[in-house]
Regions:
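A short, acidic, amphipathic alpha-helical segment used as a generic capping/interface helix at domain edges
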Residues: 138-155
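Conserved beta-strand elements of the Class I
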Residues: 88-92
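Gly/Ser/Thr-rich loops at beta-strand to alpha-helix junctions
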Residues: 45-57, 69-75, 94-98, 162-168
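Metallocofactor- and cofactor-centric catalytic cores in central/energy metabolism, strongly enriched
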Residues: 2-45, 49, 59-62, 193
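C-terminal and late-domain segments of enzyme folds
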Residues: 156-168, 185-197
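N-terminal glycine-rich anion-binding loop in soluble enzyme alpha/beta folds
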Residues: 1-26, 93-134
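Short, well-ordered secondary-structure micro-motifs
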Residues: 81, 101-104, 171-172, 194-195
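Short, acidic/small-residue loops that bind anionic groups at enzyme active sites
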Residues: 59-83, 174-192
């Protein structure tokens, strides 16, 4: 079996990650340093936990020899090939106001519909204020409502969860909406399954 190693970056904050700016300087240096440490420990895959970290993909990947996945948004070119009609793909993100083209690692986002959690959702409040107490039932309901809105208003046929904090609600959203829901966990599983003998 495989095991996971979780490392919290000393310099990272929610405000640093969920930003319209490209990450550089000491935080980017720390990401590379931690990735190299994980590689030295024998990790065969390195990921982040924030979908806004796409802009660091090429820099971190250039510094390690193992696969590096910065964001679930790396799924976009594949899904745009499979779901080819405009508005087929929706993205549920932590904050749609901060999500910019550079977060998509250079991939075309034309025809993709973005919906955010920002404003009055429970998950947004808890993450942005770094609280620990979460009303799970309310969060699940609001995540499902946001995806339902993407379906009702735009006719999306699949959704990418940008934020890994959305992953616990994936099965509920799939059951409630009957559409395909993708996240970072799917990218990790894709890699894991490819290594199985």
């Amino acid at each position: 079996g495989s095991q996971s190693i979780v490392v919290k970056l000393d310099l990272a904050t929610v405000a640093d990650a969920i930003s319209t700016e490209v990450i550089d300087g000491p935080l980017l240096d720390e990401m590379v340093e931690v990735a190299l440490q994980l590689e030295a420990k024998g990790c065969d895959l390195i990921t982040t936990s924030c979908g806004f970290l796409g802009p660091v993909q090429s820099h971190v990947q250039a510094n390690v020899t193992v696969p590096f996945i910065s964001t679930s948004l790396l799924l976009l070119p594949f899904l745009k090939t499979v779901y080819s009609a405009p508005n087929d793909i929706g993205i549920l993100t932590f904050d749609s106001r901060a999500l910019r083209p550079h977060h998509f690692v250079g991939h075309d986002i034309g025809g993709v519909v973005v919906q955010g959690l920002e404003s009055d959702t429970e998950l947004y409040r808890v993450i942005s204020t770094d609280e620990r107490a979460l009303d799970e039932e309310r969060a699940a309901r609001e995540v499902t409502e946001r995806v339902t809105k993407l379906i009702d208003e735009f006719g999306v046929r699949c959704v990418i969860f940008e934020c890994t904090n959305l992953s616990p609600y994936k099965s509920q959203v799939r059951s409630a909406t009957e559409i395909a829901v993708f996240d970072l966990v799917d990218l990790v599983a894709f890699h894991r399954n490819a290594l199985k003998g």
